[in-house]
Amino acid sequence: VQALEVDNGSGMCKAGFAGDDAPGAVFPSIIGRPKQKSIMVGMGNKDAYVGDEVQSKRGILIFKYPIQHGIVTNWDDMEKIWHHTFYNELRVAPEEHPVLLTEAPLNPKANREKMTQIMFETFSVPAMYVAIQAVLSLYASGRTTGIVLDSGDGVSHTVPIYEGYALPHAILRLDLAGRDLTDYLIEDSHGTCYSFNTTAERECQRDIKGKALLYCFDFEQEMKIAAESSSVEKLYELPDGNVITVGNERFRCPEVLFQPNFIGMEAAGVHETTFNSIGKCDIHIRKDLYGNVVLSGGTTMFEGIAERMTKELTNMAPASMKIKVVAPPERKYSVWIGGSILASLSTFQQMWITKEEYEDAGPGIVHRESF
């Protein structure tokens, strides 16, 4: 029986069958409820919409994101997202497949237990397992030791991993991620005479961010060139057919990751957070971490980000240290891909938590020593 894998992110849910090379379903982790009951006449009065359905009816719905900064904050809504994943997106009966779920680093124990309880009691899955997102990204890159900078829509983490185990004392969380960059781009582009304010327009911005933004290697230099010529400008066609010019926002927006003070945030940039995370690890493994810095998540998709990280870490690390930053081309989905690989390994099959074990031991069984 093929296992299912669901990677629940703050912004997008990625789901599919273990063993596949990419998730079969990718949709926004959003729940929408009607603003007023009466508007929905003739629409089969659903009390809640999920994912892409929400996007298409966005004018008449109130939006909620059940996952904030990587952590589930609303379990009723989360259950709806899982229900939608199994029955509408993957079209499977969850009681017939083992399910691999992913969780954010430092996810509270109670949350992990709640996920387990819902899977066994609501969806009657035969077996399940919960894996840490960054660890899966590392597996996807073919490594078991390294440090992962995972940056998604709602949160970024630096996670040092040694021989397959995340080192919890050295994990750092940065509440700066894709959504903040999108918001910054919205504010920044108000100067370009095209205003983005609703969630619909926010999606446009997310699109611009993906298509037009270039990561500059040398911020000051790029800004100087931008001031002197229009060679850095890119034209972008909006969904409504209008064309706008995206100028030096192309450098300013990604620069927020390295200089959070651009958006008034008092926090270390991603390079410094990575450096600090390595500094919390045993001195004997630091060399292995510096030599295996793996980028993961949609917010690391900017061009030139690996070169920039290498440059910044080289400036901060001891002079003799060899630094290698890897940005796999499929890193937007590397968490999911790592899970797909893991759940297909013959050695992993004994790691599943079965329904019987759950019934004997209760939700706490999920904390059993991981793989």
UniProtKB/Swiss-Prot annotation:
Subcellular location field: Cytoplasm, Cytoskeleton
Principal location listed in the UniProt entry: cytoplasm
CDD domains the record matches: ASKHA_NBD_actin
GO CC aspect terms: cytoplasm; cytoskeleton
MF annotations from Gene Ontology: ATP binding; hydrolase activity
EC number in record: 3.6.4.-
Alphabetical list of PROSITE patterns matching this protein: ACTINS_1, ACTINS_2, ACTINS_ACT_LIKE
Catalytic activity: ATP + H2O = ADP + phosphate + H(+)
SMART domains assigned: ACTIN (SM00268)
Keyword annotations from UniProtKB, A to Z: ATP-binding, Cytoplasm, Cytoskeleton, Hydrolase, Nucleotide-binding
Keyword Nucleotide-binding found: yes
Pfam families referenced in this protein's UniProt entry, alphabetically: Actin
Domain of life: Eukaryota
Entry keyword Protein biosynthesis: no
Family, as annotated: Belongs to the actin family.
Described function: Actins are highly conserved proteins that are involved in various types of cell motility and are ubiquitously expressed in all eukaryotic cells.
Protein name: Actin-2
Natural source organism: Naegleria fowleri (Brain eating amoeba)
